[in-house]
């Protein structure tokens, strides 16, 4: 198996690795992938449902700005992250999902592209000519000879800003752009506290920081666009849809995609880019949900999604339990000891993630945990990283056990070549 280098709303979690009886007849691989695709559809439907609730909460905030309506919109954003993060396991190994993902979950972002920033942010960047474009304050701007017309802030116009100038940090759409517009910058470093944007940033009658009408228009455009993007992915997982067709044509291809998703999210993306990099640098800018201090929940729900892809179990936002033929069932029929090992590793990771989340819910946010000198916090994060790395080794063994040939799992310099992080 090859590795390549690359780059409070915590769902109620119980241990997902339920016992599988040894010696049970193996399910048909096609049935396993059918259930895997059905769970994908359910997760994206749930992400869409909660995004629509977020959109409604944003409407209420804009219609009647207050601390209450701002808090409600923030809570709706956190709730929307739960099913979406559990869907991230479908990204790697499925090019349809991977090509779409950057529109909804790209990070980190240079927030000066969108709105006002603290003076400490600076006024220029060698790598980003749009670093302080502030399109909310500037309906028109000329950058590198190109005129940027943002007189109308609509889903189409902000979609055109995404990765402006081919700079990945120009994130204009998706969950994290919305997060910034609801919380504002987190100026606390590795100290306590999240972003603290006032509700008056959306109140034309008592406007703070100017341009309250345009800020509201941008927020509304971003939430409308998120709903539209999720509707697209729901359609892609319907029978015959583009993403569903990737996995359903050949069961072996589907199983490779499923295990690539589990391994790449476990190792390169979550353990590496989202966790170990920030821990090495002790840098809150490397925190996934950096404005809201919701990172612990996002990481936990990623881990839940990985376990779900293996066990075939998913709890929908309405409480419905989905179960069906699973990769775990396939492995148990071939190698019961390996299935027990795999489920045990998933349990260890979930326990570490839950411990980290409990620490955050108890008052020490993730950006504080990764702070330099916080030995206990660093250790809590490292325990979750270790669990993810360890479960990836078992995923590699599962690939061999079900005879899938070569599967590429994303790597990360943070894990494979830490010195390169400082170059």
Task: Say what each PLM segment does.
Residues 25-423:
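Mature extracytoplasmic or organellar-lumen-exposed domains after removal of signal/transit peptides
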């Amino acid at each position: 198996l090859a590795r390549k280098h690359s780059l409070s709303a915590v769902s109620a979690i119980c241990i997902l690795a339920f016992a599988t009886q040894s010696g049970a007849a193996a399910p048909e691989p096609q049935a396993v992938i059918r259930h895997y695709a059905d769970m994908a559809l359910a997760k994206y439907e749930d992400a869409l449902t909660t995004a629509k609730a977020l959109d409604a909460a944003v409407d209420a905030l804009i219609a009647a700005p207050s601390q209450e309506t701002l808090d409600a919109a923030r809570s709706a954003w956190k709730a929307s992250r739960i099913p979406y993060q559990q869907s991230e396991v479908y990204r790697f190994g499925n090019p349809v999902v991977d090509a779409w993902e950057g529109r909804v979950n790209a990070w980190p972002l240079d927030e000066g592209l969108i709105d006002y920033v603290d003076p400490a942010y600076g006024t220029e960047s060698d790598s980003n000519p749009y670093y302080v474009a502030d399109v909310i304050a500037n309906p028109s701007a000329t950058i590198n000879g190109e005129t940027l017309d943002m007189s109308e802030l609509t889903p189409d116009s902000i979609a055109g800003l995404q990765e402006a100038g081919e700079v990945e940090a120009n994130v204009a759409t998706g969950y994290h752009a919305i997060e910034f517009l609801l919380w504002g910058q987190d100026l606390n470093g590795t100290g306590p506290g999240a972003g603290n944007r006032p509700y008056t940033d959306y109140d034309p009658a008592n406007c703070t920081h100017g341009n309250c009408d345009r800020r509201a228009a941008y927020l509304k455009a971003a939430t409308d666009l998120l709903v539209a993007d999720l509707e697209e992915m729901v359609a892609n997982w319907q029978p015959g849809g583009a993403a569903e067709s990737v996995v359903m044509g050949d069961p072996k291809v589907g199983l490779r995609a499923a295990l690539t998703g589990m391994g790449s999210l476990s190792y390169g993306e979550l353990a590496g880019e989202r966790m170990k990099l920030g821990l090495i640098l002790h840098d809150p800018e490397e925190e996934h949900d950096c404005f809201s201090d919701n990172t612990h929940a996002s990481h936990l729900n990623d881990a839940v999604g990985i376990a779900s892809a293996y066990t075939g179990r998913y709890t929908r936002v309405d409480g419905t339990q989905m179960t069906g033929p699973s990769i775990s069932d396939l492995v148990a029929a071939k190698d019961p000891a390996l299935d027990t090992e795999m489920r045990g590793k998933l349990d260890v990771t979930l326990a570490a993630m839950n411990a980290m989340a409990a620490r955050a819910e108890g008052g020490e946010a993730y950006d504080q945990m990764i702070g330099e000198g916080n030995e206990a916090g660093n250790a809590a994060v490292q325990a979750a990283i270790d669990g993810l790395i360890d479960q990836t080794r078992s995923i590699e063994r599962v690939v061999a056990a079900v005879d899938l040939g070569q599967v590429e799992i994303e790597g990360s310099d943070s894990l494979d070549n830490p010195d390169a992080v400082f170059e």
